[in-house]
Amino acid sequence: MTNHWNDYQHSDVFMNIGGNTAENHPISMKWIEKAREKKGAKLIAVDPRISRTAAVADVYVQIRPGTNIAYLGGLINYILENERYHEEYVENYTNATYLVNEDYDFNETDGLFSGAYDDPVRNATSYDTESWMYQRDEEDNVLKDPTMEDPNCVMQLLKNHYSQYTIENISEITGADPEALQESYELFSSTGEAGKAGNILYAMGITQFTHGAQNVRAVAMVQLLLGNMGIAGGGVNAQRGQSNVQGSTDMAMLYHIIPGYLPPPNQNSTPTLEDYIEKETPPAGWWVHRPKYMVSLLKAFYGDNANGANEFGYQWLPKLDGLDHSHIAQYKDMSEGIVEGMICWADNPAVSGPSAGAMREYQN
């Protein structure tokens, strides 16, 4: 969540997708209504169901369940096709000008990107992402095209990828009325103008999918294109409350992070602290500080026993075994006898978790 709830009063347009703000997050709705009353803000509701939020929305787009990513892809295409993006923001504060390796490719026939291969360990398609990397000069600086006209720059690759997301195609996929799509796209993309602020609100209706991460990334891409990040009334705002998602991540209760949002060590790929730092430290961006965070964490855990001579106690830190221990995978392991017991505390996974039918089947 990038903005706080009372900041909503500064928004010009709200998009509520994958959530029911009026019913499930009434305090946030208070600030939405304040913006509507004081500055004439508009509310778009995207939902398969006519919820209480949809009932009071200025524009309601009824889509089929599970087609959020198509709807958002259509919005991205509309922004790009009609040049509604905030050009100054996109050029200076996103990677749109960056040049990608020339051998990057996307196959429209099978929907796979370059580098795809069958991973026998995961029994699924994985990617060698080398072709996705940026072009760099001799000093390892990313090559850029400020005009964003080079066919290998991120902006042109984005345009090409989303060019098939026409209103006609999106209407066919989502079942939404083309006029409602057009109206919602036009209204929300208007926030790409200087001095305007668009706010996207979402909840579990966006995240609880096998492609939930892609849904949220699509939301983020919309806001970056429109320059709606880092401003009052803008942002990508998850409506928290269910299952305390924020707390579970901030407190590192999930298997894919340790405190400080650090990737967990892996006994196969990062058996030593040197391996971890080399693998998990990017060449640029805020996470170049990751080695400092890891050492600070080890010192906090092990105190004076952690020092440079013993890798600051890195070998004492539990490590992943390379297998999938994510939420769904754990329950699948129950059905295969790998997990033989479970203590369920203050949770009802048969109801509140994703793929509830599969949850109940796996537990049996």
What is the role of each PLM region?
Residues M1-I32, A41-I44, A70, V154-L157, ...:
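Extended redox/cofactor-interaction regions of prokaryotic respiratory oxidoreductases
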Residues P26-M29, A54-D58, L72-G74, V100-D105, ...:
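Short acidic, glycine/serine/threonine-rich loops at helix termini
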Residues R49, T67, Y162, S189-G198, ...:
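Secondary-structure capping and boundary motifs in well-ordered enzyme cores
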Residues S51-T191, P282:
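Long, well-ordered, tryptophan-enriched scaffold segments
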Residues G73-Y78, A218-L225:
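Short, hydrophobic/amphipathic alpha-helical patches that form generic packing surfaces
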Residues R84-Y89, A180-L181, A197-I200, M229-A238:
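Acidic/polar loop patches that form or flank catalytic/metal-binding clefts of enzymes
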Residues N92-T97, L187-F188, A203-G205, G235-Q246:
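A glycine-rich phosphate-binding loop feature that marks nucleotide/adenosyl-phosphate handling sites
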